From Swiss-Prot:
<dbReference type="Pfam" id="PF00534">
    <property type="entry name" value="Glycos_transf_1"/>
</dbReference>
<keyword id="KW-0808">Transferase</keyword>
<dbReference type="GO" id="GO:0005978">
    <property type="term" value="P:glycogen biosynthetic process"/>
</dbReference>
<dbReference type="GO" id="GO:0004373">
    <property type="term" value="F:alpha-1,4-glucan glucosyltransferase (UDP-glucose donor) activity"/>
</dbReference>
<feature type="binding site">
    <location>
        <position position="15"/>
    </location>
    <ligand>
        <name>ADP-alpha-D-glucose</name>
    </ligand>
</feature>
<dbReference type="GO" id="GO:0009011">
    <property type="term" value="F:alpha-1,4-glucan glucosyltransferase (ADP-glucose donor) activity"/>
</dbReference>
<comment type="similarity">
    <text>Belongs to the glycosyltransferase 1 family. Bacterial/plant glycogen synthase subfamily.</text>
</comment>
<dbReference type="Pfam" id="PF08323">
    <property type="entry name" value="Glyco_transf_5"/>
</dbReference>
<dbReference type="InterPro" id="IPR001296">
    <property type="entry name" value="Glyco_trans_1"/>
</dbReference>
<protein>
    <recommendedName>
        <fullName>Glycogen synthase</fullName>
        <ecNumber>2.4.1.21</ecNumber>
    </recommendedName>
</protein>
<dbReference type="InterPro" id="IPR011835">
    <property type="entry name" value="GS/SS"/>
</dbReference>
<comment type="pathway">
    <text>Glycan biosynthesis; glycogen biosynthesis.</text>
</comment>
<comment type="function">
    <text>Synthesizes alpha-1,4-glucan chains using ADP-glucose.</text>
</comment>
<dbReference type="InterPro" id="IPR013534">
    <property type="entry name" value="Starch_synth_cat_dom"/>
</dbReference>
<keyword id="KW-0328">Glycosyltransferase</keyword>
<keyword id="KW-0320">Glycogen biosynthesis</keyword>
Amino acid sequence: MRILLAAAECAPMIKVGGMGDVVGSLPPSLIKLGHDVRVIIPGYGKLWSLLDVSNEPVFRSNTMGADFAVYEAKHPIHNYVIYLVGHPTFDSDQIYGGENEDWRFTFFASATAEFAWNCWKPQVLHCHDWHTGMIPVWMHQDPEISTVFTIHNLKYQGPWRWKLEKMTWCPWYMHGDHTMAAAMLYADRVNAVSPTYADEIKTHEYGESLEGLLNYISGKLRGILNGIDLDEWNPAKDPVLPAKFSIKNLENRLENKKILQREMGLEVNSKKYLLGMVSRLVDQKGVDLLLQVSRRLLAYTDSQIAVLGTGDRYLESGLWQLALDYPGRFSVFLTYDDSLSRLIYGGSDAFLMPSRFEPCGISQLLAMRYGSIPIVRRVGGLVDTVLPHDPENNHGTGFCFDRFEPIDFYTSLVRSWEAFRHKDSWELLQKRAMTQEFSWQRSALEYEVMYKDVCGIKEPSPDVAEVEKFSYGQSADPSLKKSIT
């Protein structure tokens, strides 16, 4: 099949959140299944120097009263085709925000539709989040192009209808209240980025005022879990890690831990319980919960906490104050550093994700891959990926709590601290976490099933049966799993 992915991000060149990882990593797995997969994104300023871009555009046109051109490039790692929509509105390196954000992405959606109609016509146009939300509305007129819309985060829903009417000249009934609603109404299939999140968003608590619409379209809604690139994220080969390691030589992690402690200004002591967090510092990620429990945890245990990220000023200030009050035990770097984030994954003992809501989450998958035990709230994709620790039966991959309450989070932290003191069982827990299967292989197979379904291809793919071989959270190496349980 010919499949075109349209999005605002594509890792590793342009990445802010999990959407960039999906758009960057899903195509290679689909290509291995025999499909012609390409990606179209806005031509942000820095991309023209990062990528080998064609000298001449492959397509020129006009939409929404402005000229644009589409250029062809290749993904720097996986070598599949990427199309860049060129227009001065994208010349800045700023991806989100700004006064013209609504116009920019509506223009990008319109340009993508023109390109798909008149240049490279896909069988499936796979749209991601509100930035591409108007594409299914326009493509609904074309029976030859089927649309799939992926919800990465329902909280961000795009411009409201009065703006859309002025920008697109579409009457209000063509897009409901905003572009997210428009996409869900008109897309042929809709998916969320985890099965649990697909169920949650149909409830009042997580539906962001769209639960009625989501229940109405539930027949075409499903959840497909994100994956990670196991080659890119491999602690045995990661060039950033000072000490490479695998389940066969976990003792090497201690060297990474000491270096992490030193770089973040913590007391260098491998026996201390080191908690890591790499996150946007926003309410969604439960940073306020961490602020509420940290003082008690540091007072009653010998734990250390290392935080990396940027976000809301009041949360940054709270974390900074903790670092001042607990030198050598609490450290925060208010930036994003890929090398340091990998060191946190590969050197911390446990990883914090006390999220209010979590559509899928990539960090817990990376933490497990690198032997850092996730401590998570049972919500969204965290339910689908982290199994509660059961030391009596040698089962589980992390520590979980249900309510978004300080006492629940604190209890999980203390339980994990106590478990850390039992080195043999902790090592088994690390090995179970590190051997979980969360590659893109299963995700690609599930997307393929959805693509064929939406295109009306009745005969099952010969690869569909393979889906059943990969249950979420099973060991990547069954023989190894038996040896460590």
